[in-house]
Amino acid sequence: MAIADVFDGVRELGRRARGSYDNANLWIGPELRESDDWHDFLQSAHTAIDALDQADKSVDALVQAVAADKPEVVVDLGDISRRLHELAENLKLIIDGSDEHYVYSLQVNRRLRAGGESMTAERIDIGEALANEWLPEVHTAIFASATMTVSKSFEHFNHAVGLDRIGASTSSSLHLDSSYDFDSNMAVVVAGDIPDPRDRERYLSALERVLVDAHLAMGGSVLTLFTNRRDMEDLYARVEPKLARAGLELNCQQRNSSPRRLRDRFINEPTSSLFALKAFWEGFDASGETLRCVIIPKLPFSSPTDPLSCERNLREDRAWARYSLPEAVLEVKQAAGRLIRSSTDCGVLILADPRLVTKGYGKKFLTSLPTTSYQRIESAQIGHYLQLWRARHERRR
């Protein structure tokens, strides 16, 4: 009963989360810890800790009582005791909140009436832990990836894995250009006239036109990567019927759908297209004619209410530029990497976020892409541009 009261309390606290859709993710920061709601929650949390400690003691006593007669159950009872102790210690860690190595948060699945609650203590600086506990014990470590640099700089990666804290003489870096001819095989289009997302109807209407025109011009084989489910589902409802009338199949990563099945269908149906979320931003391979166009409607910045972002902003003045910006750049690089998977692949990357040309940080994204040039095109002209691009590349074959 005591533990159930804790989860009920977590669900009540989750009501404070703003801007959430199905899942509330709430930072347990100073404002929350000073609230009446938190103080009410502490009562049930302390009661639960006492109950867990008492249960742990009872299990230990049972181990002592049965060890001689039933040694076969001692291991199982020991596992139970360890779990009870870990639960109590983890709950103490979170409600105390004084260990600055962690950021604390709670999560609630709003689609469930009960059973979708959790509390988390997440290490805020993995690089520090690696530099102190792992890297000194390693004789040689090699990090290799196509998406480690931001504008050809390793600064963000080195900080993330702790290399900037073990001395410059102990590590070295090397940036190698790809053997693929990205300038010939990959086009980057920036639609800089998409309305502000806060004007939702104009924003969705403009994106709808871009998406319909792009799919029709490319004849399918388009992967559109969204940052949130609401935009994806609203645009799918608008775009799918129009594509269906043109004989083009469009699938969508619905709730509880299998990413593997969506991937297999996308690969097996060469002209099908897909609206997808996080699972398809990286690690998705569809070479050749299967994938000819990737569309990113919005840059994948973390939410300003994300607990890790909130904690970093509290501790550092320029946290957004140091963490959120390079992380978003790397995600776009990962998404762009879906297009060119072999030396013969070709395709178009469409970036439909006007911040790429209206904000100074837009250059970070564009200079981090594998191709050295991009086209800024009005959204109404994207369909025509793609028709010309497709005709030109089909003549080259």
Regions found by a protein language model. Name each.
Residues M1-R397:
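ASCE RecA-like P-loop NTPase motor cores
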